[in-house]
């Protein structure tokens, strides 16, 4: 396999850089990582690394710290650069950087049109998935069961801002219904949130800070229902990798319906969707009282993800795209 230089976030324990790096290594790639967000001078440092290592391929996840000139310099050194953009947005700095890359990929299919109109040549749709080995664990201790066990769990930001506010309301509703609810993520801060969020009873359901890797998998395993409320459910064109992480570790995935999600999962058989709070409550009540069905859905979702939506699938597709465009073969 070719040597790959991976520019991605590694600065937080929950950063996705390690997931991408592990998948590349498991595919046999010689990977050298670079955390551009932690570097004082990322543009010069990445060029020096390319000079020293002579990588055939440079994969940039988001890459907001880079200048277009940097990718041009890497190209002159013989390194093929791929810019992988995960967001449903087109920030002002992005078009010039994407035009400088040899290949640009987007997480959401809905971004193909905006990228093309911005003058970015032949962008490709490439969804980030899950790296299963990063979530493996041997056992769940009694203390961990006490920490994570609940009827309904939610992993992510709970805040007063639009998009995240519906999570606050949903947790409050589930608590009023009498279910044992927990959520994991950054604690609600009085400095960042108005009194409405600070006084919410959902604060009492806080189960702890962000979870990642094995702790993420344990939280998913111990929650009978994993609730997901995407902040942008009407955004078409793909799912976030959070859907594949949750299903990949075997969670029973109950999500606010996101446009197009039936393209990726068989709704009702592999994951379950709802459209409003009343339907959410109805689905929670049903599946909490039908354990065998709940377990069957979780297992079917896990099998679908492991068979189709891992980062190994994503990188194999990426290598195929690159080879088809005359780039280096992995």
Q: Where are the language model's segments positioned?
A:
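Catalytic-core regions built around general acid/base machinery
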Residues: 70-77, 97
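Active-site proximal beta-strand in glycosyltransferases
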Residues: 74-88, 105
